[in-house]
């Protein structure tokens, strides 16, 4: 029962931390232009939730916004790892050894690691094609891991 409370609390924090970080970056880059040393990095008059004028990556890749975004993503990745470990313990307590439990843990922690790697390299510019490919592969791996989690996570019918 204690693990269920931990998972509930972690779920809320896994939502709040990135939400606050991305919106803080958006506010900084659209409203506080004097903080940015390179004026071509600022964004004018956009509300990306409506007009799609900026991506999360675009708002978080420049100084000083990456000072907010990167630590928040590291914290989120840590919380995600704890989340999947506690979920594993909950499933072991309820169901015993589920057939996809190890895969679920692998893909959950793998996606958190991909998030960390992506956050580390966000905002770093190299004009090397291998570097650009590496960044895309990391994002693709993150997405694939999340999709695999959908198929490996137990559903309520597995516990009947």
Predicted feature residues:
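Early transmembrane hairpin module of multi-pass membrane proteins
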Residues: 22-87, 111, 115-132, 136-139
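Membrane-interface helix-boundary motifs at transmembrane edges
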Residues: 89-101
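Membrane-embedded alpha-helical bundles of multi-pass transporters/translocases
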Residues: 104-111
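Generic alpha-helical transmembrane segments
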Residues: 139-150
């Amino acid at each position: 029962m204690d693990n269920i409370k931990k998972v509930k609390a972690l779920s809320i924090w896994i939502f709040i931390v990135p939400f606050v970080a991305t919106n803080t970056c958006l506010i900084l880059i659209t409203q506080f232009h004097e903080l940015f040393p390179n004026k071509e990095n600022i964004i004018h008059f956009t509300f990306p939730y409506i007009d799609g004028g900026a991506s999360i990556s675009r708002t978080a890749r420049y100084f000083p916004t990456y000072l907010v975004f990167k630590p928040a993503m590291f914290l989120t990745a840590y919380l995600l790892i704890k989340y999947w470990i506690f979920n594993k313990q909950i499933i072991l307590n309820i169901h015993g050894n589920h057939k996809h439990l190890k895969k679920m843990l692998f893909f959950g922690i793998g996606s958190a690691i991909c998030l960390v790697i992506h956050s580390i390299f966000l905002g770093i510019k190299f004009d090397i094609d291998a570097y650009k490919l590496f960044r895309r592969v990391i994002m693709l791996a993150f997405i694939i891991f999340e999709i695999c989690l959908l198929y490996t996570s137990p559903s309520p019918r597995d516990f009947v």
